[in-house]
Amino acid sequence: MRQSSQVRETKETKIKLNLQLDESTNVSIQTGVGFFDHMLTLFARHGRFGLQVEAEGDVFVDAHHTVEDVGIVLGNCLKEALQNKEGINRYGSAYVPMDESLGFVAIDISGRSYCVFQGELTNPKLGDFDTELTEEFFRAVAHAANITLHARVLYGSNTHHKIEALFKAFGRALREAVEKNANITGVNSTKGML
């Protein structure tokens, strides 16, 4: 089974994260940031991933370090779980509607870290979650996993719905990208490596 477990401890956070790419029954998220827990649960559910996250952070300051560091560890686990990347689709994309909002995510498991984020999040805070941290999370994942990730809110009016559409689209796009494909021999690149 393609999986990874990692711990990252700094003076600001302690993150324990387990990711299973081929098993979706075990999802448990506890970051201390309720809205972020909800988004990670949606990501795992719609991507059909097993995901367990325990995070302790300096949320008395704000949620920035916790959200960013969870993104870093998730990216590291994704990179490790993919092993040599042989036989995977490599590319994945998904549009997801959430009521009046529409989100889009495209992924290339390229070995090159790059993130493009486009979306106007008009409500600056949802619970304890600063909505600008949505972009920080996606940037952290893309950088740590060495993937190219485009996340875009096409339209919408409700900030919660916009972010929810992105996390669901992220799960669905990543599922497509990591899926094994019997028609692909080796890695899906003319270079012979990713």
Swiss-Prot record:
EC number, UniProt record: 4.2.1.19
Pfam families tied to this protein: IGPD
Family note: Belongs to the imidazoleglycerol-phosphate dehydratase family.
Gene Ontology CC entries for this record: cytoplasm
Species assigned in the record: Bacillus cereus (strain B4264)
Top-level enzyme category: lyase
Record keyword Transcription present: no
Matching CDD domains: IGPD
Catalytic activity: D-erythro-1-(imidazol-4-yl)glycerol 3-phosphate = 3-(imidazol-4-yl)-2-oxopropyl phosphate + H2O
Gene Ontology biological process terms, A to Z: L-histidine biosynthetic process
Biological or metabolic pathway of the protein: Amino-acid biosynthesis; L-histidine biosynthesis; L-histidine from 5-phospho-alpha-D-ribose 1-diphosphate: step 6/9
Main location: cytoplasm
Protein name: Imidazoleglycerol-phosphate dehydratase
